[in-house]
Structures are given as structure tokens and as C-alpha cells.
Amino acid sequence: MAGNNSNNLKVQKLRYLTTDAIEITFKVPDNLKKEYKFIPGQYLTLEKKISDTYERRTYSISSDPISENISIGIKRIPKGRFSTYIFNNLKEGDELRVFTPDGRFFTDYKDNQNLVFVACGSGITPIISIISYVLRTKKNSRISLYYGNKTIASTMYSQRLNSLKNSNMENLSLNYFFSIEAQDIIFNQGRITKEKIENLISGNQISPEKVDGVFLCGPQNMVFQMKQIFKKHIGESKPIMSELFFSDEIEKPEEKKKEKFTKIETIIKIKIDGVEKRINLENKEENIIDAALRQNIELPFSCKGGMCCTCRCLVLEGEVMLEKNYSLERWEQERGYTLACQAKPKTDFVFLDFDRS
């Protein structure tokens, strides 16, 4: 199962990208290179014991697969336990527990593709990995990037992006937007909005019939709006990939109507790595990941917010309700997949298969 194995990797290099963003490069030993082979767009899950509590976070891979080692980009989150530790305590030579690459923010990259990318802030992290890889390996591919930040100084990977642009003048269209810094071009002043994307489409700067795939990465509100626009113009026949960075916690109307549970105790049977285990849920509000942690049962998870899909599993028996879902597609839910971090049982017995995730 991808992303479920872990090793202690040494921090080879720390590099500040901005005052609030840092790139960590991990040294991958030769005997682990196969395990840490990744597809551009995937992420790593890190784990560290902080103040007697084991914390996990997912961070997208920023490096090109051609690199000898593997890098991630991290932005400081106000009051964020993990990012605060990274910025205040982590040093070169330290070791962190790093799970093998996981994630589904990718498509079948081919020659002669026309790809559109929209990113905000740290959402550039997986996208720069994809762009670097596509420009290097896929002939005659055209890439258009629309990248929003507050200021030039707060822009992650700006030097690397500009270098890619200079090396690929005909194949990379690089468009910066700054919300609080004046721009010579009025259109690029302010945030990336649905109105601006609509203008680009109506002005034929983005031609829906020529687009082979769209990648969206950033805050929840931006991603949801952009996804609606591109689905309207491009339809369902072409991939529109999305990844959320730091959910805005926007409450959807349907989330207000939470079903009430009548059972006091629920039995959860799980299958993982070919072994079946049982978990008891004594609290009707407890999700499956938290119950497993309480009983010292190791299950794959990371964000615990319904965003990363690391805890995706298949419901074989029983029923569950998803509290939040920002990563499962409709077809996945129809086939019985759920997110263990957000799943709360509706029946007194549930059987989940993590091996078919």
C-alpha cells in the first residue's frame, strides 16, 4: 500500500524560500531509493513527537524525480505545531520519520499536451515538481501557470520558476498575481478570481478545446471556484485535478444536517496488509482513526481533515457517514470508498478494507 511504509531520513539541506517558507531536502540512501520513487504531484507524510504527542503532516514534493534526493516545501502556519517546530528547531543532520510517497494529484503525462495550472501560495509546491518534469521529459508540451501571492517577496520558488521560464520561453507561460503589491498590468493586480479566469477563457488566452488537463492547488475557496469554472468550460472528459492546502473550513449547507447515532458501542473490523483487526468505538462521536490510535493500532493517515486521502479505504460491510470530504470523488463514494479520519459509523458493525484503497 503506497505511503504506508516509513523510515527515518536525514535532513540534508534546509533552504529558506521566503521569510515564512522553507524547503527541506532529505537524503535518500541507495537502499531506499526505490521506496521513495515518486510521481510528480505526490506528497510525503512526516511524523514527529512534539510535546509528548506524535504529530503528522503532509507536505508536497517539490523536487523533480531526476534529483538524487527528495525535497518538500513548507510554509509557516500561524500557531501551527508542526511548522513551528520545523522553523524553530529542525537542523541539518536531524532525522524525521518520513512515510513513502503517496497522493493522487497527477495524471498521465504525455507529449504534446496543453496543461493549465492555477496555484496560490504554497500550492505551488507540487505544481513546480510537475512543471519541471513535464518540460524536461514531454516533447512539445505547453504549460500555462497562473500563480497568486500577496507580494513578490512572499512568492515561493520564484527564482526556480523564472529559471524554468528562461529555459522554456516557447513552452511555459508564467503569470504572477499579487494581492497587495502594485503591478504594471492591472489584470494581474489582486487575487486570482473566477472573473479573471472567465476573462482569460473569453479572450481565448485559455482555449478550452485545446486544454488537455487542469491542475488546481491552494486554499479551499479558490480551488472550489476554479473547479466549477473549468468543469463548465471543459466538461468531464478531461482531467481537472485539485489539491487543497490548508482548508478554509467553509461550512457547506449539507454539513449542518448531521445524523444522530443511536448505538453506544460499535465494532469496526479492518483489513490492512492482509491482517484483520478489530477496533471498538465507545464514543459515538469518535472517528475510526482516533479510535485506532487510542488502541495502538497503526492505520494510514496524515491530515485528519478529509483533504489528503491517505486514509482512504473500502467499506465492505455496514454504513458510515462522512463528516467532511475534500478529496474523494463522487464515483469513489458510489463504489463504497470512505475516509477513515472523517468516517463515523451508522451501524453497529463496519468492515473496512485498507488493502483495496
Report residues per predicted region.
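Iron-sulfur (Fe-S) cluster-binding segments and ferredoxin-like electron-carrier domains
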Residues: 294, 310-357
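FNR/FR-type flavoprotein reductase catalytic core
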Residues: 85-261
